Amino acid sequence: VTTPGVPTASPDALLAALEATVARARASRLYAERLTGVRLRSLADFERLPLTTRRDLQEAGPDGTRAAPRERVCHYQESSGTSGAVNSAWLTAGDLERSAAAIRAAQPETFAPGRVILNRFPFMAAPAHLMQLIAQQGGGIAIPAGNINWDVPFPRALELAERTGAQVLAGLPLEPVVLGEIARARGLDPRAGLAVDTLFLGGAPLPPALQVRLGRTWGARVIELYGSTETMLLGTSCRAGMLHLETGLAHCEVLDLATGAAVGPGGEGRLVVTTLALEGSPLVRLDVGDVVRRAAGPCACGDLRPAVTVLGRAEDAIELAGRRLHASEIVDAAAAAADAVDSAVFFVVVLPDRLLVRIETRGGRGDPAAVLASRLPGVPSEVEPVAAGMLLDVEMLCRSPHVYKPVVLSDWRRPGRRILTLGEGMIEWPRLTWQDGRRWLGRAVRTARRRRRLARGLRLAPVGTR
């Protein structure tokens, strides 16, 4: 993906940067043989290089991508494993500093001296460390409060935001949903009672409808952060809501899923990344596994760098009613349906014959089923209103010190856990009192009954729909 007028898009400069990456990568076990003798005389030479897959990374082993001596490496990280096997990356201090500097340069109003950043990114993930580094470089005051942290459960995080007057909440997309529900339970309006003016969110799909809902609930600007464990930072969104790629850090190609050819403006395809600024674990033509859509034209914000919309992982695409749906499309439609009844708490279950969207209702007068149908025309769907606390038990969540990376969609047609609520995938259950046990048991019984009814429907469905 290149854009006229952007320095890194100059063919000569880009070719030199790609050649430098190939030279660095050759020092790793992963690329030692496959890049032997490779010389790039043109961009066409580069585009003929084979793709690197996640399977290649896994077969290379934890140390396989490391191209720098251990003496120069300061940071090791692993992917969460939500997409399969774990991948690793080794980073130098310069690798971290370049990503941090790019974020601060792209978002100067968000990260500035004196601004307080409540850093809720899990500390096994790179964004948490980038937030700390941005603060150390003069971009604010960071509060290290990772959400997978026994010391800072959700209630304490909310209290920290109140006490410190935090202006930036940085974390996974569900973080402001959970904190907003806890604030609501305590009679606190996040818009009026907190100083947060920016939600800096990444690590999971952040569809437009959810961005709108969160922005309205918090009275804050929503910024999307995009990257991966393997590639580090790939981009952040502008004020026009477009996700701009960091062309100084990575060269990105968008290739047609069927033909492998580059797609034009407005086209969809798999994202292939070559890192330009990583010394520790450089990567050449990595298929990151995501499907993106290129912007159809120049962005209204004036930024000439290419912009994309992340549609979801290619392997997570769902075939239903003759249509191929990306996870982001489904989650976006579900978020809009929930917003129609003044809620941000929802969970999607993919069944053989339909989508089931479960929504904690808040008394809004909209028609969530109509909204869902308008967003996903022709897709069989059902909206199930449930009582507050059925999908996200705020009280129980407040007592649980251990919270996992959340999911809002579960495909019951595939092997694995059949999740029905947000809480099932997030919480390590604490010891219950008698009152807690009675309340939890009643909720669990209702959920179990619903699960059995849905499972019975799976058994009765025609074989061809499974």
Regions found by a protein language model. Name each.
Residues 197, 206, 210-298, 316:
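Conserved AMP-binding/adenylate-forming
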Residues 162-172, 217-221, 242-251, 402-413:
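A polyampholytic, Gly/Pro-enriched intrinsically disordered region
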Residues 22, 196, 341-343:
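Core-facing hydrophobic residues within beta-strands of well-ordered domains
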